[in-house]
């Protein structure tokens, strides 16, 4: 008999720092086993926030899929800022190059709703614009 899915959850943890807690307890999975597997799987991404989609089954087993670090976090790291602008229409908090945007877009491409790097760059540029980050060397589209 096939396992029945009881819940699907989208969570974010720091790489190698998942700990048993309320978020995992509500899923009804084997928390120590999840934290061990997650921490092992994220060894190479130390210091990054790692989104994860956890599928919990009725027999307390689970599967999980690691996603790429959120674009806003990658943009903040590239720009060297703590947070985005409180009013992005009037404030510019940092400037980054189009090359940095391309680098982020190439990394994020697997998780974005884009068919190519140029489309992914537009998505990342939109996130940057909403954070008050200006991009040099990239034409603006409205």
UniProtKB/Swiss-Prot annotation:
The Gene Ontology terms for molecular function here are: large ribosomal subunit rRNA binding; structural constituent of ribosome
Please give the CDD domains that the UniProt record associates with this protein: Ribosomal_L11
**What does UniProt give as GO cellular component?**
cytosolic large ribosomal subunit
What the entry lists under SMART domains is as follows:
RL11
Modification after translation is described as: One or more lysine residues are methylated.
Q: Which UniProt keywords apply?
A: Methylation, Ribonucleoprotein, Ribosomal protein, RNA-binding, rRNA-binding
Q: Write down the InterPro entries for this protein, in alphabetical order.
A: Ribosomal_uL11, Ribosomal_uL11_bac-typ, Ribosomal_uL11_C, Ribosomal_uL11_C_sf, Ribosomal_uL11_CS, Ribosomal_uL11_N, Ribosomal_uL11_N_sf
GO terms, biological process = translation
- Is the keyword Metal-binding in the record? no
Q: Which purpose does this protein serve, as stated in its record?
A: Forms part of the ribosomal stalk which helps the ribosome interact with GTP-bound translation factors.
Q: Which family does it belong to?
A: Belongs to the universal ribosomal protein uL11 family.
Q: How does it assemble?
A: Part of the ribosomal stalk of the 50S ribosomal subunit. Interacts with L10 and the large rRNA to form the base of the stalk. L10 forms an elongated spine to which L12 dimers bind in a sequential fashion forming a multimeric L10(L12)X complex.
User: What's the protein here called?
Assistant: Large ribosomal subunit protein uL11
């Amino acid at each position: 008999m096939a396992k029945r899915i009881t819940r699907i959850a989208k969570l974010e943890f720091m790489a190698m720092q998942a700990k048993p807690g309320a978020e995992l307890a509500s899923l009804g999975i084997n928390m120590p086993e999840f934290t061990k597997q997650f921490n092992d799987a994220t060894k190479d991404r130390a210091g990054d926030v790692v989104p994860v989609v956890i599928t919990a089954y009725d027999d307390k087993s689970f599967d999980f899929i690691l996603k790429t670090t959120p674009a806003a976090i990658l943009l903040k790291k590239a720009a060297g800022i703590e947070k985005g602008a409180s009013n992005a229409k009037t404030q510019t908090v940092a400037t980054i190059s189009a090359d940095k945007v391309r680098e982020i877009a190439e990394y994020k491409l697997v998780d974005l709703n884009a068919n190519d790097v140029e489309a992914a760059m537009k998505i990342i540029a939109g996130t940057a614009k909403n954070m008050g980050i200006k991009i040099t060397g990239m034409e603006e589209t409205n």
